[in-house]
Structure formats: structure tokens, C-alpha cells
């Protein structure tokens, strides 16, 4: 057993802990000294036990810093708007956002008043968790500083944190589905009189491209699958849950696996995002749950009609209103190492900040566009997840989500030991119904971006007395479904969660009916139907949905590709021969041993997405699981496009230097731990449930940056939960840690691990180790 003594004070890197005034100032009177017991089991997963929230937070912050100090320190720099100060304005964040634009966003977002308001809205339990987290993190930081910080963050930008930093991190997560996607557009919004046409066009065009690409990547990088099986279909007659969130493998959205216990009050295990002292996805003694990124709208744009006399004033109900002006300043590192303060004015209307995208959301002499983000007023998010963590029944779990309404931009799926399966699309959504949308928007714009008339008050969000926040939908008017067979979700609307009970008739901002399903949802519904026909559904069946790596779209189009290959190809026959042979030999999966035919297939189908007439059978809302399907190779234009796509695929593979005998495991890898590990899975758009997003690496390889992250399959018996799982990218982001690649290797080998939950299971783990930490009481 490792027993750590209380640490009284630390001085390092020229900084004393006495300087963390914000954190110290926020400590509530009467706090007892924090004490936590951190028990580590296999793969370094911490099981943290404490008598109260402060002690629990203390253990969480300490354990997290042991495993991910550099990661969190870097994110703290980001949310403080200080990247330009330390790294220069022209470099980019991990999310490929320009440092200067990022800093301006967070300087605008995380003002002292915004942080104070958020903190004041938190109940004592949440404050205690956060205060404990800060103390635990700072203790670990001091210890590691004495020993020598990890090389990636042995730098001046690493410092003790405060509760304000945790608030900043939380608010950053809240706006991921809204204004967070508009950093460049917010930073570049400039009144027409101050615009320099050529310069602004170039800068803003780039901003638009980056933001649009990030908007598209949002669902890809933060997608997910979840399946909740009820007692009618489960092999043991109890609830059974598959959680398969697809999240980034690095940065501020990288999950951390842990188990949190306050005896008699809390006992929950699962995964959490950086800086959060609670579980986001997991299970407790009574239930298990997961989240999937929803398709609901969490912000609206408002077209402002400008005052002809002044483009920084707008007309509202016929009255001229001055835009708000908030000056933010970013400290920018100069070439000689000195700092220069760069001021910028962020303009806003009553709806929110003005954003500017040339050619799409222009700020000219007539109009400007303002963005209203529903989650900017969501100060309930931490209370929400803590209530879910503590829920002792599915009803209590559901009631908490209905009442608190703190879920920012995800659906929730859950099961309980009694065999109920629950789906809730209860996130924070602007209260704009179909009638108001019809009155207040241009139908030609569509619903990809909701643009409302900003010149009329009646077009603002409706306020309902039932809602937890002014201007959002009350939970009673959002999709919910309780079943005893199944519910599932893979980032489509709520419509086809279970085809036996379609969820229809909601505001377009919440959920849209009659839209084509994504390939992963079609795969899941098809697989569940097959399993249902064959008998009861087992844990192994749910694991196989992820790990057998079926490429669902191959079943729809591969026969047509092979038929085309067997047709008269003329002068292209010789060039296409390797491709056609590889497609014929391919097993239709994204496994490590799957052949190079999968690479050709990806490239072909990516090219064919631009061909609107490619499907032989068009989408039919009466049969959304099986349509659209088949490549219309008998259509001359489709055949021409297909031939071109195949030839381009041949050229791409040759250019990448991939040998004919290459296997998918030779190509798709993860090397974030410092060594290359083959990774199975593939693109979500092809119907690979085990979705992976990659970027180009060296020698034709693809480096995984996002995808399957925390995996869990949970069911129940008389004693409680029985869970198996994995954290695909491993527990630690420090390449020097023993736990930076161990779970990644297990994931590569498809080796699910039993998750120790009970005291007996934890203490019986071969890797069991205990560390007790405590702090001195307040004096």
C-alpha cells in the first residue's frame, strides 16, 4: 500500500501555491480536510473512494493529473484565451483552429462575470467536487514538478489551476454544439465601414472554410452508437446496454475512465471528459447509460436589419437599437519573445454575438447575422450529470433529466436491472416550433442552419413556464421512448429509434421525420432484426456489433461493383485489374486482416457521394432501413462516374505506395503513445459501426484521430451490474506512462476486459494498488 503524507506547501518554477487566489477564495467555510483513497486496477483505472464530495474531487483531480497532466494544462491555456501568448497567434489548436481566433472566442466567452454567475448557480455538492479537484490536481502538479514534469509540458505555461479554470473548461464543452463552431466567424466580424475588401475577403473565406469543415467534423468526431436492450429480447431477461461513443483520441474531448464512490451516496463507474469531476457515460448499481450526439439544433442565427444611418445599429420592431460592444484583448507573443496586447471589439445584438462568413453570412450595409446559443445559459450541466450518477432507479434517472434539463447536445439511452430500455432526446433546444419557423425564416435556406428574422421580437424563441431555462423547449415536448424490446441510436434524428414506435411530429429544431438514415443506424436496425429473429440477444452479440467490423454499405453496392468489373472495360481493363481483383478478394469488413480491397472501396464510394443519381433504389420513407440501395450501373452517367472513381482510386493507391498484399491493419494505426498499433474499424459513412476517423500519415498510413473511445457493455444479475469494456486510446496521454497504450493494444486484439465494480472484484484484481492522499485542514 502506498500512503502519501499531507503536503503543506509547494514552491516551484518560481510560483508559490499561495498565488492561486481564485481557487482559495472560492473555498467555502467549514470545509474539512479532503481525503481520498485511490485504488488502481488493471490498465491503471482508478477507483476513488472518499467520505464526501470534496474528498472525491480531490482524488479525481490527483489521479487525472497523474495520468494526463500535460493534456489538461494545455486545455487550460486554451480556455483562458492564452494560446497566442505562449505559442504565437498563427499556430493552431489540436482542433485546427487558429490560435488568435481561439483566444478571442474564449476571452469573449469566459468573462469574470460569466464565471461568477456560473459558479453562483452551482449547488454545494458541485462546488465541493470542483474545489477538491483543484486541490488534488495542484498537489499532483507539485509532486511531478519536484520529480520533473513530462517533457511535453515542462514549460512556463503549466501552472496551478483554480476553480475558474474548471468553469472555463465546462463552458467550453457547453458551446461545442453552438458558438464554439464559429470562432473564426466571431473573431472576424467587422462593421462594413472598417472592412478592407481584399484582405477581409481572403481572411474570411478561409475562416468560412475552416468553420464549415469543423461543423461537418463535429458529428464525425463526436458521433456515437448506443443500443439499449430490454427484457423481451435480452438473454437474461434484464436490461443490457452497449455504449460506443465516437470521440477524439486527444485533446479536450478525450475520455478518462474511473470509478467514483462516496459510501452510502454514490457508486458509479464509467468515463468523463477532461476537467469534469463526475461520470458522463457509465453505470451504477441500478442502471447503465450512454449518450449519442443528437441532430437537434442548439443555436439559431438571427438576420439583423441594419439602421441605414449606422451599420452598428439594427432595427427591432421598428426601433433603432445600438449593438453591444465588448472589447477583448489577447496577449500575443512577438518574434523577439515580447508580448503585445491586441484589442478586438466583439459586436452583439440582444440575441448574441455578430458573426460574419463572406458569401453566406455577410455583414454589409443592410444586414448582419447574430448567433444565439441555448447552452450559454445552461448552468445546470454539472448538476445534471451528478444527479444521473446518483440515480437509484430508471425513473429517478429520467426524472432528473426532465427536470434539470442540463444535457447540452446529446441524446441519452439507458437500461435498468428490471429490463426497461429508455431513449431521451432531452437536450437544450431553442423553443421554435414549425409554425414560428415558417413565419420567421426563408424556406429556401432549409434547416441545416436555422436563420430567423431578427427585426421582429415575435421571431425570438418562445418562453415556456415549464422549461428549466427561458427560451428552450420543456422536456414534455421532446422525444422520449420507454420500451421493453430495444431502443438504439447512431446520430440520426429521433424518428427511427425503434421502427415499431416512430417518434414523429416534433419541431424541426428537435427532430425531423422522413429523412434518410445514416449507414450505422441502418446497420444497427438490420442487425437487431436478425438477432431478434434468431432468438435472444446476448452480451456477445452486442460486442460483435462493434468488433466484427462489418462494412454495411458493402452489402448494398459491392455486388454492383463486381458486376461492373466483369463488364467490358475496354482500354481501362488492365489498369482496373488490380482494383477488381482486390474487391473480389475483400471480406467486406474493416478488420486488421481485411485486404486492400477495403481501401479501394472507400475511395470509390467517397467519389460516388457526389453523384446524386447513384442509387438504383431511391430512399423510401416507408422503408428507411433498406433504402436507398444498389448502384445504378445501368445508368450511363453513373457508369461513367463509377469508372472515373475506380481509375482515381487506382492512382491514389499507387501514389500512396501501398503494396497489393497490404492489410487494413498495416494502414490504419494509432501512434499517439509513441509506438504504432494497428487499429480496426473504419469510416462511419460506410456503415462501419466501429467508426474511426483518420488523417494521412507517413508511407500511405492513416492515423486515427477520433472514433470508438470508451466502450462498455453492461447487464445485470442479482448482485448488480456485470460490465465489460475498454478505453480504446488508453488511460494516460503521457507516452512515458505504462498506461499510454495498454488498452489500445487490447482494443487492437479485441480483448474486452471485465470492469471490477464491487469491493471483492476490485481487491481481487491482480494489479490492485492503493494510494491514500489527504490535505491539511483549514486553519
UniProtKB/Swiss-Prot annotation:
**Assembly information from the UniProt record:** Heterodimer of an alpha subunit and a beta subunit processed from the same precursor.
Signal peptide range equals 1-25
Q: Where is the composition biased (Polar residues)?
A: 731-746
Q: What class of enzyme is it?
A: hydrolase
Keywords assigned by UniProt, alphabetized: Hydrolase, Periplasm, Quorum sensing, Signal, Zymogen
Annotated spans, Disordered:
731-750
Answer yes or no on keyword Oxidoreductase.
Answer: no
Miscellaneous note, as given in the UniProt record, is: AHL-mediated signaling mediates quorum sensing in many species of Proteobacteria, regulating hundreds of genes, including many that code for extracellular virulence factors.
Q: Name one GO cellular component term.
A: periplasmic space
Q: Name one Pfam family in it.
A: Penicil_amidase
| Biological-process GO terms, alphabetical | antibiotic biosynthetic process; quorum sensing
Q: What is this protein called?
A: Acyl-homoserine lactone acylase PvdQ
Organism from which the protein derives: Pseudomonas syringae pv. syringae (strain B728a)
Q: What does this protein do?
A: Catalyzes the deacylation of acyl-homoserine lactone (AHL or acyl-HSL), releasing homoserine lactone (HSL) and the corresponding fatty acid. Possesses a specificity for the degradation of long-chain acyl-HSLs (side chains of 11 to 14 carbons in length).
Q: Where in the cell does this protein reside?
A: Periplasm
- Please give the residues making up the propeptide in this record: 202-223
Q: Which reaction does it catalyse?
A: an N-acyl-L-homoserine lactone + H2O = L-homoserine lactone + a carboxylate
The family line of this record is: Belongs to the peptidase S45 family.
Q: Where would you find the membrane-spanning parts of this chain?
A: none
| Catalytic machinery residues | 224
State the gene name recorded for this protein: pvdQ
Which molecular-function annotations from GO does this UniProt entry contain? hydrolase activity, acting on carbon-nitrogen (but not peptide) bonds, in linear amides
Keyword match Phosphoprotein: no
Name the EC number(s): 3.5.1.97
